[in-house]
Structure formats: structure tokens, C-alpha cells
Amino acid sequence: MTIAEAEQANQQMTQRAAADGLEFRFDIIRGGNTFDAHRLLHLARDHGLQPQMKERLLRATFTEGLPIADPPTLVRLATQVGLPAGQAQAVLDGDAYAGAVRADEQQAARYGITGVPFFVADGKYAVSGAQPPEVLLRLLRRAYEDSSQLTPVAVTTDGNSQSSCDGDSCRTG
């Protein structure tokens, strides 16, 4: 992607975000390693606060230009969504959730994820990039339609399941 193409993509994302009431400030975004932020997302999940923490991190990054690789900033953001400061600090001081984040990274590699956003539905359908709602709706409908199809099975008298369909015919017992 050329610089001009990247600038155009950023402008399109900024316009889409603005249409949804979000402010993206690419001029103030600070780069940095987000590994610790992802570890705090796992802590937040354990407290039932993962969506709030994710939204807070995104706003801090894209709207406020905060350094989310900075541990004191991360602790402050965590407490703003209701996480105990001591627990957030303990995660950052140790290696808690490091394995979970590495597992997430490995799963992302298996999916072929190279950027965000990236949406996966039912573990097998995906779209990359900021997409309009109708694209995401098609993704969800496809995953739902495929997951709601039944595969008949018969249970033998010994309790073992076996496929009840062979070719074009199925048996019922």
C-alpha cells in the first residue's frame, strides 16, 4: 500500500466512524506494543468488563492519542472501567495472561489475520477491514444459516452414534 493509498484508507475510515458518531484522530495516534493492553483485556473478561475495556482502549488510541503501551496509562484506563488498580498493576508486573494472549496471536495467524479490524463468525467465516453494516450482516447470516443446518444421526442399541445418511438416503432408526 502506498502512502497515498494509506491516507485515503484512513480518510475513509474517519468518515465511516464519524457517520457512526465516532471521532478518529489519526494525527495523534501513538504506536506501540499492545501486548500488555491485550493482557488487561483478559483480566477484564474475567471481571465481565471486556467490552468496556476494549472500547476504552480504542477511544484512548484513536480519539485521545494516549500511549496504551505505557503501564501507568493502562492502569488508569483499567480503573476507569471498574477494574481494581491493584489487579491491573499485578498483571502488568508479572506474566499473567501472557499465555492466553500468545494463544490469541496463534489463532490469529491460523486465520491469516494481518490487521484489524478482522471479524470471524462461527470460527470459519471472516471479513477483514472496516466494513459497512450490510457486509457484517451478510457474514452473520451466512454463519447462522450454515450452523443451523442439522446433520441427522442414528443411535444404535449400544448407545453409539453413527451417521444415518448414506448417499441420497437416510434411515431413521
Put a short name on every predicted segment.
Residues 1-61, 166, 170:
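Structural alpha/beta surface segment adjacent to cysteine/selenocysteine redox centers
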Residues 42, 46-173:
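C-terminal cap of thioredoxin/glutaredoxin-like
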